[in-house]
């Protein structure tokens, strides 16, 4: 009978199937988003509450931190690995694995945690909200993360333009010292840990981890060749882990609530909650914490009030900050906001800074402006980046006017491919990908613009 039913395509009801197979595991989650308030880690993103120590304590920061520290590095690393947390700065490397690289037998050199708060990517402003309105989350995260990797101090490298944020952070650090939460015998755990703030001077390239280390050491912010990696030779020649602000700030909550709790959000390999910036042509630009793998359309419509002029007025979206390729409206309809789904869509999650562009946007001019930014911020160390991005910038300026030949589109694509993957750091990639996204999805717009320019030029010549 069962064989006949199989031939007919008939399947057992779910409960009966479970009883026959003995499989009692819960069904896989298939819908994502609508994060509940009680599951939010960042509860003061908009600065409606007191950001100082008293307010932070009332919101659950520094709760049972001593117990977390006393459980030791292996336990903390275990929870972080269980959580499935991946780096929130753009690369998406598994955090537990990265932090565990520091747990080698000591050779006598001190270990350091460096927090990358040099948030200079156009469209990205999530970390500054944490530092400005929830600085104690970051300070506590430094302590917990430092304990996990056996570090003795944390250096928070903050963007030079973040004046108010640096001030708030310094106040939070002073309060933590005065309360005995950091410093000698931090939280009464017997563990000594210091936190220092280093202010940058406006160079976007210092967001790259080795350029950041060079800057802390007082040198020019130019990326280093790897290997050696920072976990072996980092700041002051000592083992160092460089981590993003959001990555560090969520670690105490993961340890308090458990890695399994955090892993319950989002798809497999894309777990947890995430801060998203939504800017551009939306009714209510915002920074919001939402579940990973939330549909992009739902994210924009629920939290940002939708696209100006309605969803049908959408032209394209840059989903992860200026260095990720844009995606057109047709892709935005169904794509999920996580690492794997966006890679499949030929883009990336990056910093999760969603830049929305409606049909009023000159898409060619918008991308050309981003290329000008990368040309300006290139440190000039690598020839493909120094020469290639400058060349792309000049070509894109002509593309904006339409003063080019269709064959130059393929030439521009080729030069972007010669830059991508051929530089010491990822700035070259960040300049190449927006161009590739434009050509991939808006080639007809480029060709039409060139055709219009040629017709106008011919008409002017005929008139003269």
Curated annotation (Swiss-Prot):
<dbReference type="InterPro" id="IPR054765">
    <property type="entry name" value="SLBB_dom"/>
</dbReference>
<dbReference type="InterPro" id="IPR019575">
    <property type="entry name" value="Nuop51_4Fe4S-bd"/>
</dbReference>
<keyword id="KW-0830">Ubiquinone</keyword>
<dbReference type="InterPro" id="IPR037207">
    <property type="entry name" value="Nuop51_4Fe4S-bd_sf"/>
</dbReference>
<keyword id="KW-0679">Respiratory chain</keyword>
<keyword id="KW-0285">Flavoprotein</keyword>
<dbReference type="GO" id="GO:0005743">
    <property type="term" value="C:mitochondrial inner membrane"/>
</dbReference>
<dbReference type="GO" id="GO:0046872">
    <property type="term" value="F:metal ion binding"/>
</dbReference>
<feature type="transit peptide" description="Mitochondrion">
    <location>
        <begin position="1"/>
        <end position="20"/>
    </location>
</feature>
<feature type="modified residue" description="N6-succinyllysine; alternate">
    <location>
        <position position="81"/>
    </location>
</feature>
<dbReference type="Pfam" id="PF22461">
    <property type="entry name" value="SLBB_2"/>
</dbReference>
<keyword id="KW-0488">Methylation</keyword>
<keyword id="KW-0809">Transit peptide</keyword>
<protein>
    <recommendedName>
        <fullName>NADH dehydrogenase [ubiquinone] flavoprotein 1, mitochondrial</fullName>
        <ecNumber>7.1.1.2</ecNumber>
    </recommendedName>
</protein>
<dbReference type="InterPro" id="IPR011537">
    <property type="entry name" value="NADH-UbQ_OxRdtase_suF"/>
</dbReference>
<feature type="binding site">
    <location>
        <position position="425"/>
    </location>
    <ligand>
        <name>[4Fe-4S] cluster</name>
    </ligand>
</feature>
<feature type="modified residue" description="N6-acetyllysine">
    <location>
        <position position="375"/>
    </location>
</feature>
<dbReference type="Pfam" id="PF10589">
    <property type="entry name" value="NADH_4Fe-4S"/>
</dbReference>
<keyword id="KW-0004">4Fe-4S</keyword>
<comment type="function">
    <text>Core subunit of the mitochondrial membrane respiratory chain NADH dehydrogenase (Complex I) which catalyzes electron transfer from NADH through the respiratory chain, using ubiquinone as an electron acceptor. Part of the peripheral arm of the enzyme, where the electrons from NADH are accepted by flavin mononucleotide (FMN) and then passed along a chain of iron-sulfur clusters by electron tunnelling to the final acceptor ubiquinone. Contains FMN, which is the initial electron acceptor as well as one iron-sulfur cluster.</text>
</comment>
<dbReference type="Pfam" id="PF01512">
    <property type="entry name" value="Complex1_51K"/>
</dbReference>
<comment type="similarity">
    <text>Belongs to the complex I 51 kDa subunit family.</text>
</comment>
<dbReference type="GO" id="GO:0045271">
    <property type="term" value="C:respiratory chain complex I"/>
</dbReference>
<dbReference type="GO" id="GO:0010181">
    <property type="term" value="F:FMN binding"/>
</dbReference>
<dbReference type="GO" id="GO:0051539">
    <property type="term" value="F:4 iron, 4 sulfur cluster binding"/>
</dbReference>
<keyword id="KW-0408">Iron</keyword>
<feature type="binding site">
    <location>
        <begin position="87"/>
        <end position="96"/>
    </location>
    <ligand>
        <name>NADH</name>
    </ligand>
</feature>
<keyword id="KW-0496">Mitochondrion</keyword>
<keyword id="KW-1278">Translocase</keyword>
<feature type="modified residue" description="N6-acetyllysine">
    <location>
        <position position="104"/>
    </location>
</feature>
<dbReference type="InterPro" id="IPR001949">
    <property type="entry name" value="NADH-UbQ_OxRdtase_51kDa_CS"/>
</dbReference>
<dbReference type="InterPro" id="IPR050837">
    <property type="entry name" value="ComplexI_51kDa_subunit"/>
</dbReference>
<keyword id="KW-0999">Mitochondrion inner membrane</keyword>
<dbReference type="InterPro" id="IPR011538">
    <property type="entry name" value="Nuo51_FMN-bd"/>
</dbReference>
<feature type="binding site">
    <location>
        <position position="385"/>
    </location>
    <ligand>
        <name>[4Fe-4S] cluster</name>
    </ligand>
</feature>
<keyword id="KW-0520">NAD</keyword>
<keyword id="KW-0472">Membrane</keyword>
<feature type="modified residue" description="Omega-N-methylarginine">
    <location>
        <position position="257"/>
    </location>
</feature>
<feature type="binding site">
    <location>
        <position position="382"/>
    </location>
    <ligand>
        <name>[4Fe-4S] cluster</name>
    </ligand>
</feature>
<keyword id="KW-0479">Metal-binding</keyword>
<dbReference type="InterPro" id="IPR037225">
    <property type="entry name" value="Nuo51_FMN-bd_sf"/>
</dbReference>
<keyword id="KW-0560">Oxidoreductase</keyword>
């Amino acid at each position: 009978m069962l064989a006949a039913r199989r031939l007919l395509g008939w399947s057992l009801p779910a409960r009966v199937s479970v009883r026959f197979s003995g499989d009692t595991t819960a069904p896989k989650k298939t819908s994502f988003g609508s994060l509940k308030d009680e599951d939010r880690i960042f509860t003061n993103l908009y600065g409606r509450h007191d950001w100082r120590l008293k307010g932070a304590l009332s919101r659950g920061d520094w709760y049972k931190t001593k117990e977390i520290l006393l459980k030791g590095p292996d336990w903390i690393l275990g929870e972080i690995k269980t959580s499935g947390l991946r780096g929130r700065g753009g690369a998406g490397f598994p955090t537990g694995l990265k932090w565990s690289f520091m747990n080698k037998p000591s050779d006598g050199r001190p270990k350091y945690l460096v927090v990358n708060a040099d948030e200079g990517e156009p469209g990205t402003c999530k970390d500054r909200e944490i530092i400005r309105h929830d600085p104690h989350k970051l300070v506590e995260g430094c302590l917990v993360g430092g304990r996990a990797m056996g570090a003795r101090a944390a250096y928070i490298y903050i963007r030079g333009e973040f004046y108010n944020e640096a001030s708030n952070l310094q106040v939070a650090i002073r309060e933590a010292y005065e309360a005995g939460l950091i410093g000698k015998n931090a939280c009464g755990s017997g563990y000594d840990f210091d936190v220092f703030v280093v202010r940058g001077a406006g160079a976007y390239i210092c967001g790259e981890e080795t350029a950041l280390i060079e800057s802390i050491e007082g040198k020019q912010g130019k990326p280093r060749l790897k290997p050696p990696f920072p976990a072996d030779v980092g700041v002051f020649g000592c083992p160092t882990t460089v981590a993003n602000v959001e990555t560090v700030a969520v670690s105490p909550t993961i340890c308090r609530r458990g890695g399994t709790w955090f892993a319950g959000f989002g798809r497999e390999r894309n777990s947890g909650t995430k801060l998203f910036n939504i800017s551009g042509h939306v009714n209510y630009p915002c920074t919001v914490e939402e579940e990973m793998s939330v549909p992009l359309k739902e994210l924009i419509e629920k939290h940002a009030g939708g696209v100006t002029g309605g969803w049908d007025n959408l032209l394209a979206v840059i989903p992860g900050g200026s260095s990720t390729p844009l995606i057109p409206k047709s892709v935005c309809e169904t794509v999920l906001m996580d690492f794997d789904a966006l890679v499949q869509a030929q883009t990336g999650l990056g910093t999760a800074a969603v830049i929305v562009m409606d049909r009023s946007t000159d898409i060619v001019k918008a991308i050309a402006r981003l290329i000008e930014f990368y040309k300006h911020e290139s440190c000039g160390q690598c020839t493909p980046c120094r020469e290639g991005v400058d060349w792309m910038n000049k070509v894109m300026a002509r593309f904006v006017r339409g003063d080019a030949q269709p064959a130059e589109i393929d030439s521009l694509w080729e030069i972007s491919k010669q830059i991508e993957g051929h530089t010491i750091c990822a700035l070259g990639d960040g300049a190449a990908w927006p161009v590739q996204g434009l050509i991939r999805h808006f080639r007809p717009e480029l060709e039409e613009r060139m055709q219009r320019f040629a017709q106008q030029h011919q008409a002017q010549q005929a008139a003269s």
